[in-house]
């Protein structure tokens, strides 16, 4: 959110629509859950005890060869999603997947591998637990633990992770051939996929995916001639022998420690004194962004809003919705100071805004494959917002944040509609982002997910031009007039025409003719296999 913003109408054209979209949730309702397919979830532990080592799945029939499916190349870091589970308190022993340093006196510090009994797991994101080693009790983040001796506790198990995110992780610089992970299958409920980094002379570094099937008697196999009682034994076998795979499994794919869901238990509306502003990262028309520390323990980003920017009551109501939007391509909202001046506390992203990254950082040297992959990540996050029936309203490079390994996350979703500034609400002047805004939104205030699609098309031009201001040489009033007459930006220098065609789809005059974000995500993720397989790097891209 700043001096610029974006919007447009909902209702995808039929050729882009799919039938498996989750039921949408109104953005004005404050009690909905995150999308189960993509959100960074906490385990749901409730109800009766279950066997965590039982993995029911649809059996597969018939023999199978060692033919991998899929494949790709790119770079990114993702967080493995925790397992879904249920239990009654204290029966199952849990094991720590990561180290955790206590942030409050009520928290419990622990090391990876430490074991716990869960005392109270009714709180969702934070559980009361007792360390078996020390006897100490305290709250722990529920997405940092898994049932001991379950598949979720294995280092190589990455849970709900899509093919593309697996490829981004495995293809990170420094990873070697044979590095691997196991994840849930995207296409077959209850099944698994083995993803391995490979290399060949034609494709260079790439990733191969093998489907792990289940026998009627409960065993697992990739090929029927080699069957195993458990996934653990299957992985152990292929770590010792390639046995038909593209390469023997070597080391487990490294990953980053996931973000906790919130700063701590009950840390939502926090006192201003608990925050220390340390390094000013930027400023805009409505406030500043700082790197800071919460409670003397936790690095965070803090957005400070100028008094009068928005009504505190309206902000708090919207923030309650925003904090429920959970997806690994959205910057998580941790906490708020709800009295003016309003503070918004979020995850700190190491590389700052995408706009600055492209203009002044490492982004200046990126080639088209990396830029398209970043666009695909943004589309992934926007597809989630689309499924949740929410609207961003200010989608542009300045509101995308970049982390390590070219991770992109969407920030400031939903805040633009709360701005009280007269110049902004009149959709005129320097504070309003005319150049990113769909005409029906700029002229008539009709902001929908389809105006976000228009804005995404503008964001694509920012990516391929390394942060150039859209419509170069034109002032806001001229842009609005020319766009209404049918003018659209020409193909940027070095940009493939196929990518410009996607931009023009986003800029269709009729909002209903613009593609869905689901379509855009699919198009960009498969861009170099389906659309531009003969891509050769040029001077700029």
Swiss-Prot record:
Q: Where is this region: Disordered?
A: 1-43
**Keyword annotations of the record:** ATP-binding, Cell junction, Cell membrane, Cytoplasm, Cytoskeleton, Kinase, Lipoprotein, Membrane, Myristate, Nucleotide-binding, Palmitate, Phosphoprotein, SH2 domain, SH3 domain, Transferase, Tyrosine-protein kinase
Question: Which biological processes are named by the entry's GO terms?
Answer: cell differentiation; cell surface receptor protein tyrosine kinase signaling pathway
Q: Which is one Pfam family of this protein?
A: PK_Tyr_Ser-Thr
Q: Does the keyword Cell membrane apply?
A: yes
User: Can you name a GO cellular component term?
Assistant: cytosol
Composition bias, kind Low complexity: at what positions? 26-37
Residue ranges under compositional bias (Basic and acidic residues)? 1-20
- Reaction it catalyzes: L-tyrosyl-[protein] + ATP = O-phospho-L-tyrosyl-[protein] + ADP + H(+)
Which cellular compartments is it found in? Answer: Cell membrane; Cytoplasm, Cytoskeleton, Microtubule organizing center, Centrosome; Cytoplasm, Cytosol; Cell junction
GO MF term list: ATP binding; enzyme binding; non-membrane spanning protein tyrosine kinase activity; phosphotyrosine residue binding; signaling receptor binding; transmembrane transporter binding
The entry's ATP-binding residues are 281-289, 303
Phosphotyrosine modified-residue sites: 424, 535
Mark the residues modified by lipid (S-palmitoyl cysteine). 3
**What residues sit in the active site?**
394 (proton acceptor)
* Xref: InterPro entries: Kinase-like_dom_sf, Non-receptor_tyrosine_kinases, Prot_kinase_dom, Protein_kinase_ATP_BS, Ser-Thr/Tyr_kinase_cat_dom, SH2, SH2_dom_sf, SH3-like_dom_sf
Respond yes or no to whether keyword Cell membrane is given for this record: yes
Q: SH2 domain location, by residue?
A: 156-253
- PANTHER family, per database record: TYROSINE-PROTEIN KINASE
UniProt similarity note? Belongs to the protein kinase superfamily. Tyr protein kinase family. SRC subfamily.
Identification of the protein by name: Tyrosine-protein kinase Yes
């Amino acid at each position: 959110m700043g001096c610029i913003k974006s919007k447009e109408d909902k209702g995808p054209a039929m050729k882009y629509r799919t039938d498996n979209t989750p039921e949408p949730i109104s953005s004005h309702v404050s009690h909905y859950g995150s999308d189960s397919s993509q959100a960074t979830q906490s385990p749901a532990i409730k109800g009766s005890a279950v066997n965590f080592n039982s993995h029911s799945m649809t059996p597969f029939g018939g023999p199978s060869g060692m033919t991998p499916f899929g494949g790709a190349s790119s770079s990114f870091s993702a967080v493995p999603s925790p397992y879904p589970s249920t239990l009654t308190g204290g029966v199952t022993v849990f094991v720590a997947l990561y180290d955790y340093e206590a942030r409050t006196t009520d928290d419990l510090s622990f090391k990876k591998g430490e074991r716990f009994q869960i005392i109270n797991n009714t709180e969702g994101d934070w559980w009361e637990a007792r360390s078996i080693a020390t006897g100490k009790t305290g709250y722990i983040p529920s997405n940092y633990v898994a049932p001991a001796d379950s598949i979720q506790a294995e280092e190589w198990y990455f849970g709900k992770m899509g093919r593309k995110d697996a490829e981004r992780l495995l293809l990170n610089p420094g990873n070697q051939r044979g590095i691997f992970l196991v994840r849930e299958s995207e296409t077959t409920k209850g099944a698994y996929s083995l993803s391995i980094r490979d290399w060949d002379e034609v494709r260079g570094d790439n990733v191969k995916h093998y489907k792990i099937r289940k026998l009627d008697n409960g065993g697992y196999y990739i090929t029927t001639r080699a069957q195993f009682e458990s996934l653990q034994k299957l992985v152990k076998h292929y770590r010792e022998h390639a046995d038909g795979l593209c390469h023997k499994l070597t080391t487990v794919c490294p990953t980053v420690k996931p973000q906790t869901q919130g700063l701590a238990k009950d840390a939502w509306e926090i006192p201003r004194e608990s925050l220390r502003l340390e390094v000013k990262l930027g400023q805009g028309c409505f406030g500043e962004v700082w790197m800071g520390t919460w409670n003397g323990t936790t690095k965070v980003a803090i957005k400070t809003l100028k008094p009068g920017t928005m009504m505190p009551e309206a902000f708090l109501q919207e923030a309650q919705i925003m904090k429920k939007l959970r997806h690994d391509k959205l910057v998580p909202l941790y906490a708020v100071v709800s009295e003016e001046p309003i503070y918004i506390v979020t995850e700190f992203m190491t590389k700052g805004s995408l706009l600055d990254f492209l203009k002044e950082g490492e982004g200046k040297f990126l080639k088209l494959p990396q830029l398209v992959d970043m666009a695909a990540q943004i589309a992934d996050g926007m597809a989630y917002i689309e499924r949740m029936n929410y609207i961003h309203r200010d989608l542009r490079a300045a509101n995308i944040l970049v982390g390590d390994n070219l991770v992109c996350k969407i920030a400031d979703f939903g805040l633009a509609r709360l701005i009280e500034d007269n110049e902004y609400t009149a959709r005129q002047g320097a504070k309003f982002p005319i150049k990113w805004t769909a005409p029906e939104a700029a002229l008539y205030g009709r902001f929908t997910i389809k105006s976000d699609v228009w804005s995404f098309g503008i964001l694509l031009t920012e990516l391929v031009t390394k942060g150039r201001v859209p419509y170069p040489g034109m002032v806001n009033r001229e842009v609005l007039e020319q766009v209404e007459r049918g003018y659209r930006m020409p193909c940027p220098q070095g940009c493939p025409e196929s990518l410009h065609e996607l931009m023009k789809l986003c800029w269709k005059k009729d909002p209903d003719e613009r593609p869905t974000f689901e379509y855009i995500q699919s198009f960009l993720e498969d861009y170099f296999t389906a659309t531009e397989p003969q891509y050769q790097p040029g001077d700029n891209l």
